[in-house]
Every structure is written in C-alpha cells, then in structure tokens.
Amino acid sequence: MNFQKMTYSNLKHNRYRPELGKTSGQISKMNTHLIDEQNLAGSKNWVDRSLAAVWHPCTQMKHHESLPLIAITRGEGAWLYDDQGNAFLDCISSWWTNLFGHANSRINQAITKQLEKIEHVMLAGFTHAPVVELSEKLSALTQGNLGHVFYASDGASAVEIALKMSHHYWQLQDKPEKKKFVCLENSYHGETLGALAVTDVALFREAYGPLLQSVFIAPSPDSRKVKEGKSAEGLVSECAEALETIFAKEHQNIAAFIIEPLVQCAGQMAMHSPEYLRRVRALCDQYEIHLIADEIAVGCGRTGKFFACEHAEIWPDFLTLSKGISGGYLPLSLSMTTEAIYRAFYRDQTSQGFLHSHSYTGNPLACAAALAALTIFESDQVLEKNIERAHELAHAFRWAKEDSRLEHWRQQGMILAFDVKSSVLKNPSSFAREMFSASLLEGILIRPISNTIYVMPPYILTASQTQNMAEAVQRALTQVLK
C-alpha cells in the first residue's frame, strides 16, 4: 500500500481491537466494524471542517492532503476511538501526557468534585486548597529540597519561568553579567522564544534564529555515540570534560545549564547515564551555575523513579514538570526551586519580586487532577509495578534487538526506542509519516521522530496488551520497509 495516499476510509479495515489476547482473525469474526456511507460522510465533515478552521500543531498542513486526520470522539483506558468506532491503542500516551488511561474514573471524580466548588480564581492575591496541597506534596517528593512551586499551563512556559528566575536571581546577586545559558546538542525544551533558544533541533529553531538569544551548546552524552571498542563511561567523561571547558571559560557569563535528565525525548530519545548528571551537578556547584532539570517529559515516573534526577541522587536548582503531572487531563506545568532562590526575591521592592504571571496559573481543576494522579501513584504502587511493566515492554520488543534493519535498541523505564538504519530507508524524509499511517491501519498510535521508533505507553497496559502492541509495531514496520 502507498501510505502517502492512505485515506480515512482505509481505516475500516482496522484489525487491532481492544479484545486483546485474540488473533486478528478471531477479532475480525467477533467484531469487524464496517463504515456505512452516512457515517463516512459525517467523518469527512469533521475532518474537512477541522482542516478548514484548525491550525494543527507540529504539522505541515499540506501533508494532510495525503496524510489521514482522525476525528477522535472518546477515550477509554489506553484506547482512543474515532467517530467510526475504530480503536487505536495510545502507545505514546497522547504526546507523553496520559499516565492512567483516558476517562479514568478517579481523576474524573476529582475534577467533578472540584468543579462543584470553584473552577478558577486568580492566584495573585488569592490561594485555594488544591494548589496548596499539590505544592506541599510535590515538595515532599523532593524531600524538601525544592520547596517552592511556580505554576503555568504548558511545558515551554515552565522552562521560561526557570530561565527567567535564574537570570533575575543573578541580577539580584549583583552579577548581571551571568545571563547566558548552556544546553545540550540536539536538546529540545519548547517552542516559546526563551525555550526555543535552548533548543538545538534545527527543524524547530531555524526559522526563528534571528529572534533567539545565543547560547552555548555542549556535546550530548547520547549513548548511540559510543563507538566500537569504546565505553559508555568514556563517553560520559568526554562530554563532562567538554562541558567543563565551557564552564571554565565562560562561567562568569553563564546563568544556568539546562538538561532533560536521562532522555532527550524530542531529540530522538537520546539516552544517557545517571553518572553524567552527577558530573554536571558537581560542575555547576564548582562554577556557581544553576542546574535546570527539564522533567516535563521524563518526570512523573516515566524513567522508573518519580523524578529522573533521583537516578543520579542529585537535585537541581530548578525542576520543571508538565504533561503527566495532571494525569494527562488538563494543561498544567510548574517550576520548582530552592529556598535560597526563593529568598533572593523576598524583598521590599516590588520590582525585585518575580512578577511573571499567567491567567490560569494554579488552576484549581488542573491541580485537583494532579492531586488525583499523585494519589493513584501512591495507592496503586505505580512505581513499583512499573518495574515489571518495563520488563514486559523489553520482552515484547525483543524482536527489534534481533532485526538487522534496526539499531540502537534502548530503554529507560517506560520509554523504549530503536532506530531504523538509514541504509534501508527508501524515503528517509517521509518515513515517519509512512510509519504513522501504517500504524493506524494496525490500530495503534505511534509517532516516530525521524528514523526513531519509540513507545511511551500509559502505566496501565497488561502484559498481553504490551505484547500485541509490539507485534503491531512490527507488522507496520514490515509494511513500510517492504
């Protein structure tokens, strides 16, 4: 099949259904969904209206002339359903956000209960129970090391807050020259101008280069860079030494170093050792530079611990969270910081406070969802059970280790990725779109990054669901590469 010409109606052959554990043939006999002309017309109507009125994110809209746009009407557990009844397993947690399944009854109830009290109130001059309780619980999760929480609505905004706080802190310390930032090569921290400045993915930043502050870019300790005969430890040392070279020369001008701990997610799931984080923490202390841990994607248990930094037994000066913190329900982000940094802004002069704000800062509904998510973590022993889920994930994708067309199989907790060798790609620039389309025909949602295929599923899959997911990825890949 020419996946570039795939249309919405092709999905009527969707054979990957929620009745997992059965073969696709058994499923077809049980419950094959047929699209009638009236329903198909309705579906096209929603799609056409969306294409006419909605500018979709991270998308070249012209690609939708051939790439399917799916009208989702509901979700249940790990499944998304379109308006034709086709089911898609959400293998990437709806852009890494959904932790405990769609329409989770406990999170639904928490939001509904809060909705009956207060839906929103400005956080300047006011406070409310959900934001207080959430802040206290998050602080406790850091053993009090990061005891102050500033809220926003999306990941990039949380990064902006950390960058601005760091910059402003050094001004208050009479070191205004410390205003530069350091990031890793191939890093991604968001799309707003400050966050984009510390992003090193050309696809996202090239068009806006003239608007962005210049930054220092340090080599990434990406484990895929380990050469034959070399060790991962050696790569960590090389990258740490290169970072120290930057610090030694420019520390008087540097405010902070920002990093996604353990996994550079949008950077093709590049993974590195916790030892690198330990080296970075020591260097930041030595050269009086703030450490910003961007845990927007890797936080909330995704790497195996609640905070990725815990693997290295270090705490940053700033830590950002978003995506999974509300269980994937509502826009919520935050930047946590230390008592020392908070106290630097605690002054008589208004101008020396941190005057950043957003209209929906600390929204009660979003905070209620986050509190429900934290309760699920505790009551369901999610982190402990994710150890077994991670083993099941590795076992299900063992075929990818043995496939000669693939390389760089890697895993960190509930993130698993591998790369398709460039030598087997017929059209490298369109591979991700072709794989996305092929996966829909198998009833799964994946969204490759260039030649990197990855899964980041919700924390609710059974072993059989995980196995079926892996088999569906394998079938889709076979179709694209044949």
Q: Where does each model-flagged region fall?
A:
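Short, linear, compositionally biased motifs with a strong N-terminal bias
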Residues: 10-13, 371
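Short hydrophobic targeting helices and cationic amphipathic motifs
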Residues: 3-4, 11
